[in-house]
Amino acid sequence: IRNVSSKSFSGKVEYELYDRNGNKVQSGSKSFSLSKGKARTTTVGMNVENPHLWEPDSPYLYQLHVYIKDKNDNIIDGYRRRIGIRSVEFKGKDGFWLNGKPYPYPLIGANRHQDFAVVGNALSNSLHWRDAKKLRDAGLRVIRNAHYPQDPAFMDACDELGLFVIVNTPGWQFWNDAPIFAQRVYNDIRNMVRRDRNHPSVWMWEPILNETWYPEDFAKNVVDILHEEYPYPYCYAGCDVTARGSEYFPIHFTHPLNGEGGAFNTKTLNPEISYFTREWGDNVDDWNSHNSPSRVNRVWGEVPMLIQAQGYAKT
């Protein structure tokens, strides 16, 4: 809470939690005072008995109303958010657990670019929802935001439709040694986590820069920043198993059985680390010829897409 007025303020933070039928299930408040120009964090606890838990096949959402009121009980500011109650745990060799139980279903997913024909990335909210609906109807359960945070409308759709989301820091194949570059990435990560941390669809965070050769201390710093901005349980970060500083991450992305060989085909598994196949069957040849069976050749028409589909069918 930040007091940007020219005088001191005394009041309270008040919250109300409603179920999907509009019934109030919990409420509370906490008084506070702020001098002019000052800011503070106010924490208000909440205990919900027998909650409806969020999960992909039953994505139950509550409505949270938060108000700032003055000493005369006038509403000065506030917001409303849909939230879900759930726990996610990555337990190394014991796999992924949701709401205290091993998750029994295949974690099939895709990378999603925020893009549509003609309009580019200027998608309407309805197009974001349409994308999420089609992906969920196709049987997908995990979406990786490639390679930047997606529009809030897409995150809202994933909350509503039951899709896990891997949230990515904006950045791709570029590093600058100037200190200001890392500082701006750190700011991006803080803003990203603050914006999306209350979405039940957030499965894990990818706070590194995609396919980028960054310094090892950068890897440690981004994990520390993530936990500063989300200092609660069920907060996980992932990176490539071959990346610098991967020892700071509880989740490693590997590419087993995809024909690439090399370090991504991990031979020695750490039972404390969770390994996730981020790209399945992604057979890149030399990155130049564009004749990989799993990627679309950069030429016009449907032929390259049909070749890609045939390649995946044979994988």
Residues covered by each model-derived region:
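Secreted/periplasmic carbohydrate-active enzymes, especially glycoside hydrolases
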Residues: 1-157, 162-165, 187-188, 203-204, ...
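Substrate-binding/catalytic cleft of secreted carbohydrate-active enzymes
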Residues: 129-134, 142-315
